[in-house]
């Protein structure tokens, strides 16, 4: 796990360095916003030298730029939001109106080529059914997937 975190950290540093053309350890927020907008629209993002240069390098309270630690937090918050969205999409595949029931789990597993009996599905659900209502709600599903 630690190795994975080191690799992620190295990757974040590499991406940050691509934005930080002036090598001042800061990236302007407007540069990041332009790049994100370009990615969303399918265009190629252009990072100018001027975008990444702090006009006054002595000034350490520039709230219009991000240092590496801020950049990492921003990326990781985005990753968490993506994980939550992915979990919701996965949950929708299994759920009936009230949540994942043994019947809906059996149906989905069957579609995935993993046939289980209704009793097997009841046992699987009981392992993560925190409130013991026989149904997996989204919060229980999230806990199960972590």
UniProtKB/Swiss-Prot annotation:
Annotated spans, Disordered: 44-65
Gene3D superfamilies linked: EF-hand
EF-hand domain boundaries: 7-42, 116-146
SMART domains attached to this UniProt entry: EFh (SM00054)
PROSITE patterns in the cross-refs: EF_HAND_1 (PS00018), EF_HAND_2 (PS50222)
Expression induction: By touch and during darkness conditions.
Binding site for Ca(2+): 129, 131, 133, 140
MF (Gene Ontology): calcium ion binding
CDD domains in alphabetical order: EFh
Keyword annotations from UniProtKB, A to Z: Calcium, Metal-binding, Repeat
PANTHER family, alphabetized: EF-HAND CALCIUM-BINDING DOMAIN CONTAINING PROTEIN (PTHR10891)
Record function comment: Potential calcium sensor.
Protein name listed in UniProt: Probable calcium-binding protein CML40
Native organism: Arabidopsis thaliana
């Amino acid at each position: 796990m630690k190795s994975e975190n080191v690799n992620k950290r190295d990757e974040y540093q590499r991406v940050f360095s691509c934005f930080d053309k002036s090598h001042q350890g800061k990236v302007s927020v407007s540069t990041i916003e332009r790049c994100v907008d370009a990615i969303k629209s399918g265009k190629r993002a252009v990072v100018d030298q001027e975008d990444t240069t702090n006009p006054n390098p002595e000034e350490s309270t520039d709230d219009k730029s991000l240092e590496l630690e801020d950049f990492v937090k921003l990326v990781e918050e985005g990753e968490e939001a993506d994980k939550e969205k992915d979990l919701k999409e996965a949950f929708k595949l299994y759920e009936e109106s009230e949540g994942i029931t043994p019947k809906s789990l059996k149906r989905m597993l069957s579609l995935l080529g993993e046939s289980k009996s209704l009793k097997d599905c009841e046992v699987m659900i009981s392992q993560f059914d925190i409130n013991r209502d026989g149904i997996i709600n989204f919060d229980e599903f999230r806990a199960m997937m972590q």
